[in-house]
């Protein structure tokens, strides 16, 4: 059975008031994400070891294997993008509340300290990649990954991500990655999704 592109969890124009145009999703979701799905299906076609496997299974199975780098890169990018869409929400951003805020304050000292550290991780990821909030051995941590890599390969639980590939922000912010990061933290973070991941 072929892998399928997950639907956007919002209308393509739903985030325009928060700084992300429908055109961004036309290209980012409609072309980039779709291409990863199409490429993955071509690469695993006829390979019995991938039959019935989830994206997470494929990512873990192929991580670090140079002979299967194409499969890993496309599978991870399919997963990363689906996770990223769910990390976005109209009228999102700002500080979380309740138990999640308590955990962030315990791990980073304050929400503002978390925000500063996350923004720095996203801004300093050289070239293409992702910034993440993860749970690692019961502790919240911020990490970043290059290209298609993701925390699943390190046994970490992803809670939140921000895509810092240039195609993620060039339509809306041109080359101003820091502005894109600040806008995400202030207006777009889906804390309900983060809380659900933490509780899972």
Range-by-range predicted roles:
Residues 1-200:
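Feature for soluble, non-membrane regions of globular proteins
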